[in-house]
Amino acid sequence: MSEGCTGNSCISWHNLDNKLVVSCPLSVVRNFYSLLTLDDVHEVVSKKHLLWNIKRVIEAEVHLSLHNFLRSQAGFPSWPHHLTMARLVARALRLGRSALIQVGAGCGHQGRYRTSFIASALMWHGSVIIVASETIQQRLLKVEIPRLQQWLPANKSIRTGDIWPSPDFQGLLLISPAAWLKGQLAHNNPFPAHIPTIIDGVDDLEDWVRFQLTEAIQPQDWDQLMLAYPYQVELIREAKVQLTHQLFQRPENPYHCYLISQSEIEILHKLYLSLEPNHLPEIWRNFWQKIPNIRDYSLTSPSEFPLFWATIARRQGLFSLYYAPIELSKIIAPIWQRQPVVLIGSALEPETEAPLFRQRLGLDDVTCLKFAADSQGEAIQLYVPYKLPLPNTPEFQGALIHQVRTLVCLSATAPGMTVILIGDVPLKARVGAILASEFGSRVLVEKTCLDENGILISGWEFWRENQSVLPAPRLLIIATLPLPSLENPLVAGRVAHYKRSHQDWFRLYLLPKAMNELQRAIAPVRENQGIVALLDTRVVNRSYGAQILSSLSPLARLNYLDPSLFSTNNEDDAG
């Protein structure tokens, strides 16, 4: 028999005839009563307590164990949805029904929710796979799992690696997204079917999948092709020279990549027809299998149209070729049919059902849940100036630099880091040089070795990848909305795909991408209820602005800037 008491809340359970019998106050029971069916629960007796005979309902056991664990942990990071999430994950494991959970950007950044799904995975009687990045795996192995193992009635084998341990393995396997997807997309999937799988951090799932499906030809692969066809070296070299000539005639862009043109496709196709297919190196065989799909645009359906691009290194005179599908849903939909999955993300979409995310990834029948943010503990202070020029006007850069300098000066004496997010590469360098001339070594461009009151100037990608190792900023300045730039050839290629399909490319692609990026970028500021200055007036001058502002809730709007906003006293008052 097991028992746990917290104040007046006593919970006990024991096995009786292979069934779990639970006794606990109604106040504790109420939280998970709605998840149990009449077949699961038999009310037995008592006015003050309810005695349940539960037929192996894992939700109840997880709820009660985690409830006692959380009450026993002094100073444990509070999150009001621990028990709800643990029950939903446990229910998905029991029923074999997939689920999609949005925990919110603030919670996603802090990672507090992981206690919930780890508890369910440890207490589940069968094998479970957890797909998470290497960094998250280390956090689970060193912190979350040992802490729970000391309390929960579970003794589960835990393994890490890229392959399934053994046919009779009944433990918990931690695996990276790349290794898991590689196995799932392989012709001979090394993972058994029907293994419940929890995927953490699915905000990046689409990028993970597309990366796994990308075929690449690197400069050294041309040497391998020449070795495979010693009598046709000149033919291969001539095709490479033609491609180099055409690619290096393209005007430079900040992204160093270019969509492949029809004439360049013809060069590759002509080379392919001149070679004996049976002797092709594997990497070339895989790559050339895609070329027939893009030779004739008129014969390719919009849903099958791929991205085909090149990156170039001008100084070295080298180029690489890449192919990746745009539409992923049909390719990966079979994965979700092979095993039940629990997908956990931060802020995928404003809607609980995340319809666009599910459509892009072929997710049909899933239980969807979205947790609300803490309206008091996670609220940011948002400043949006009304009179700044729009980003696409000549006056914008000068006005932006003046506004950034004003903000930095106002907060100069306040403790805490300042982060300035600028997506435009030349503008980022210019702002960095101007601020460094005034504030000296406090200013760094995309470096992590900052002082306590340092000023970091960063692009969106650098900030996303490094915010977990940096202190939460007191002030976050955002130059423009992170709408993917149409000047990026890869973005332009995806937009062209939506246009060919007669779809609203802005509301289906650019806007959701920007909203997700924005919420994740702001998440660290919520830790100390800091200030976010959004200097892109499109949020007040465009119809979609209200949708963006709504996605940033909870927030308090600031109509003016004053040094007192950055004072310690003001911070204490806000808390």
Predicted regions and their residues:
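Conserved Walker A/P-loop ATP-binding site and its immediately adjacent core
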Residues: 100-150
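Structural recognition of the conserved hydrophobic beta-strand(s) that form the central parallel beta-sheet
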Residues: 130-131, 173-176, 196-199, 340-345, ...
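Switch/connector loops and helix/strand junctions flanking conserved nucleotide-binding motifs
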Residues: 138-141, 181-183, 205-208, 350-353, ...
